Every structure is written in structure tokens, then in C-alpha cells.
Amino acid sequence: MESPFSPVLPHGPGEDWESTLFAELGYFTDTDDVQFDAAHETYENNFDHLNFDLDLMPWESDIWSPSSHFCSDIKAEPQPLSPASSSCSVSSPRSTDSCSSTQHVPEELDLLSSSQSPLSLYGDSCHSPSSAEPLKEEKPVTGPGNKTEHGLTPKKKIQMSSKPSVQPKPLLLPAAPKTPANASVPAKTIIIQTLPALMPLAKQQSIISIQPAPTKGQTVLLSQPAVVQLQTPGVLPSAQPVLAVTGGATQLPNHVVNVVPAPVVNSPVNGKLCVTKPVLQSSTRSTGSDIAVLRRQQRMIKNRESACQSRKKKKEYMLGLEARLKAALSENEQLKKENGSLKRQLDQVVSENQRLKVPSPKRRAVCVMIVLAFIMLNYGPMSMLEQDSRRVKPSVSPANQRRHLLEFSAKEVKDTSDGDNQKNSYRYDHSVSNDKALMVLSEEPLLYIPPPPCQPLINTTESLRLNHELRGWVHRHEVERTKSRRMTNSQQKTRILQGALEQGSNSQLMAVQYTETTSISRNSGSELQVYYASPGSYQGFFDAIRRRGDTFYVVSFRRDHLLLPATTHNKTTRPKMSIVLPAININDNVINGQDYEVMMQIDCQVMDTRILHIKSSSVPPYLRDHQRNQTSTFFGSPPTATETTHVVSTLPESVQ
């Protein structure tokens, strides 16, 4: 239920509201003994018997007239307080006169005084005129300053007369229609405090309805007893309007209204108005609730600000995402275009490559013809003619212009040896050309034959010296063998031969003319037999040993050789080998043959080794018999004195 009350009570200049208000309230007596339960009291709103004709006082009567104050467009604003203000409508002194004795005020007013001027609160309501009820009013509590002014207020019985004492006219507010009190509506207590400048109201969500009063008079109707609590802050903190005026809404900011039941007791016997004691209530609870409400409002404001900021950030984030999406889409389109262009270029390159890979038939035919012409030039008749012409030229080779120390055969043998030398020289001259011209290229076959391995430079003088010594060694063995054979055949012939040797003692070598012999004496002594026979007789043996014309051969069928291995080996050079064989001294006067053995040492490098299988039929007959004897001697008994112990067969280069 809403309680109408006025925020401001104007006063006339020069009047002491405090003195007049509490002076009149001091006459109320017998208020301490009267208690009434407002919950069990019924009120009747019968305004037909009420007299609202007021004898208004001359001070500012036009301001408080209903025509000037209560209008549809009124706007209530908190203003600085006068020495006295009121939050409820109070009837004028004349209105109490016009009303019957049944009028009563079912409210309890708590007046809290301070060092400043207090606020006045009056409220009355009209009841049924059938019975006269005494008016019950509250006894104001004066502050410390008022106690010194008034002192003890005497209790006076208020006579229900038609002419009460004159009091200052308070502000009249139209009363709202009274509704029966419900148990669910809490009681309210209105606490009035004196303020220095403004009268702020406590923060509550209660609405005060103000309606225009009738023309004849003004009646204030409070739905429930209430005590208005006014706080001391000079500024009215407000967040929501609480004052509603009919016709035009004028609201006062937040206030706190605590309603407590205020019983009113009607005393028909003595006709006195019983006024209850004022209820004193501290403002600490309202202050705490105000702080809580203020904090709640601050939290609401912060929440709204944070929500606004979050919405703003979200909007900015969405705008950024949209911009990035647009940039990504544009970049994607650009990349698609570039990808398409690259694919087209790749297709063009692939097609061009395929066209270039397929050769035309004309080019293929030309290539085949060039290859055939090259083959014909290398293996054709022109190359053969050049080779034939070259075969005739080797006769001029310097290999044929060498000195022959001994010649034992006739002219035919010389021609045969010359032909063999020509063939061998041609073969090596063809493989390794002696031409040193810079711009002349030797003709080689199409199939490349790798040249022989690199050989160190050979001194020509040293080569000739070695060749001369080897040939002399072979021929000396031949001379010794021939001499021993003739001595066995005929002593006479031996003497002649020895005489001839003595005559030619000045020469170291001597040429011996001999004829072919079909058989050789098997009783020959220890000697080196040089084999001179016709090429056709022992051609099979030469083929078996793969004889080469530029190589000296030492053939032995004995098994009792002294072989000494090498103690060191150099991997970067060819293996070296020395052959030590019996030799004949050039001059018997140089070394005595009785105390020393004359041997020939041949140092050479091993070029190759291989195993040969020679047929026994190809071996010369005289070597075959020696082979049998030496084999049996090597595996059996030692040889006899009559058997040959050292037989070496030497095959010279010049004879085949």
C-alpha cells in the first residue's frame, strides 16, 4: 500500500515553526497509557460528513491552494529545506474544527530531532460520522537544542471543540483512497530527521501517489501507519523515481520507507485524542542498505560497461575476420589465375618436347649413311692399299741395319732371317709408330687396340751392349760345342782346328762353317749346345713354345736347378729375375778355368708366366734322350760320370 507524503513544507517568513509545532504537541496528554492494535481496527472511508472548509491563514495562502499546487503537469524536485518540512499531509486547524469528533489518525509518527530545525508530519483521516472517536497523535521527541528551549512539555487534554488553537498551516497533500490493510503488506515506519540543506529520502522502490484534493477541503489518507526515515546526506542520491503524481508523473529519487503498525485507540468516554509514544529507530540499517544498493548499482554499471566493451571488441573482431576473409578470397582468385596460366605453359612445353623427340625420317637416313661411310673409309680397299704399301717400306727399318757378329749359314739362310726380321719389325712398327711429326697421325684400325704399357726410356747404346753380350755368349757355346764334337770324331780334325785357333788368337770370335747333321753324338761332354737346324725340321717345337723373334730363349729339361727366391718385393715395379748359366771365357788367359767356374748371369724383368704343354714328338731327339736320363737321375740314383750333367739348349734369334 502506498503512503502519500509531501517532501517539502513551506513556511512563512518570520515564524518559528519549531516553537509553534512543539508547543501545540505539548498539550497532548494521556498518550502514554493508550495503546491500540491497528491490525484489529477497521477504518471506513466516508468523506460525505467531513467538512473540508478551512479558514486559511493569510501567509502564503495562494501558494498552497489546490488550484495552484496540484496540477496535471506538476514536477516535484528536491529543494533546500526550510526550518520545517513534512512528508505527510496534515490538516489545518480549521479542518479539525469542521470534522466531527469521530475523526482519528491511525498512524504513528516518529519525530527525530537534531540540532537543526525538525520536520513536521501531520496526517489525519476521516472515519465514519456515526461515532465520535478521539484523535490520537504522536508525541514528538525533541533534540538537545529543543530541550533547552521548551524544557518539560506539560501534558494537556485536548478538548474536541470546534475551535482548536491556531497552528501554522502545513502542506496539504491529497489523500489516496484507503484500502483495507492486508497481512501480506509489511508495516512501514516513517522516520523524520532534521537536515541542514536538503531532505534526501532513503532508497526504496515504494511509490507515492499524489492526487488532487476536493475543492472544499483537503484530506490526507495514509494506507498504513508509517514512519518516514530521513537521512542526513545533503545531496539526494537517486537512480529511480519514486514519486508519482496523477496527471503528470513527478518522482522523487530513492528513499527508504519502513512501515510499522501504529495502533490508534478511540476513547469515547473522555473524548481525548490518544497519542502514542514516538518510535525511535536508528538509521544504521538504512545506511547499510543504501551502501548495498549503491554497490549493486555500481556493479550493474560495470557489468554494462564490460558488456558494451565486449560487444565492441566482438564487433571489431568480426570486422577483422571479414577483412581477412576478403583478402584471402582475392588472393585465392589470383593464385587460381596464376595456376591456370602455369598449367597452360606446361602443356605447351610438354607438347613441344614430344614434337622434338620424334625424329624425322630424313634425319635418320642421313645419320645411317654417315656411319656407313665412316666404316667404309676405315675398312675399305683404300685402307688395305695403304697397309700393303706400308708392308713394303719396313725394309728400310733401322732394325735391319744392325751388325751380325757371326754368320754360319749361306745366303739363303741370310735371306730367310732377313724376311723374318722384316715381319717382326713391321708388326711392332705398325703398333707403335716412330713418326714424330706433330701434324701427322698414324693410321689405326677402327677397333681400338690399347697400346702396350708405358715403358721407361731405354738407352740405345746400353741396349746394343746387352744384345752384343747375349749373342756372344750364345755363339761361344756354339763354338765350344762344335770343337768338342770334332775332337771326338777325328783327332786330326781337332788338331787342325786347334792350330787354326792358335793362328787366330788375336780375334776373340771365330766363324765355323758346319753342315747339317742328322745325328749328334750322345757321348758329348758338358757343353752348351746351340741348335742350328732348318726351320722345317723343328717347327712344331717352336710353335709349342710360342717363339718370338726379339726374345732369347733358354730351354732346359733338367730338374736339378738351384732356385733362390727374392727377399724383398717392390709392388710398383715388375719382378726381377737373374739367370746364371755356364759360360765360356772369352780369353783363357784372363781366368784360370781350373780354380773357377765361368758363369753367365742374365738380369731381366718378368713380363709374363704361363704353363706350356709340349708334345714329346716335337722335342728334338738328342734333347729327348737327355730328358729321360735327367728325369731318372732326379728321382732316382745319381748320374754317372759318363752322363752329361749340364746340358743347356740355346735358340738364337737369327736361326729358325
Curated annotation (Swiss-Prot):
CDD domains: bZIP_ATF6
InterPro entries, A to Z: ATF_bZIP_TF, bZIP, bZIP_sf
Record site: Cleavage: L406, E407
PROSITE patterns: BZIP, BZIP_BASIC
Lumenal membrane side: 399-656
Location of the region described as Disordered in the Swiss-Prot/TrEMBL record: 81-171, 632-656
Sequence segments annotated as region (Leucine-zipper): 335-342
Ranges for region Transcription activation: 1-137
Record's bilayer topology term: Single-pass type II membrane protein
bZIP domain span: 293-356
Membrane-spanning intervals of the chain: 378-398
Pfam families: bZIP_1
GO BP annotation list: endoplasmic reticulum unfolded protein response; eye development; positive regulation of apoptotic process; positive regulation of ATF6-mediated unfolded protein response; positive regulation of autophagy; positive regulation of transcription by RNA polymerase II; regulation of transcription by RNA polymerase II; response to endoplasmic reticulum stress
Family: Belongs to the bZIP family. ATF subfamily.
SUBUNIT field: Interacts with XBP1 isoform 2; the interaction occurs in a ER stress-dependent manner. Interacts with LACC1.
Protein's UniProt name: Cyclic AMP-dependent transcription factor ATF-6 alpha
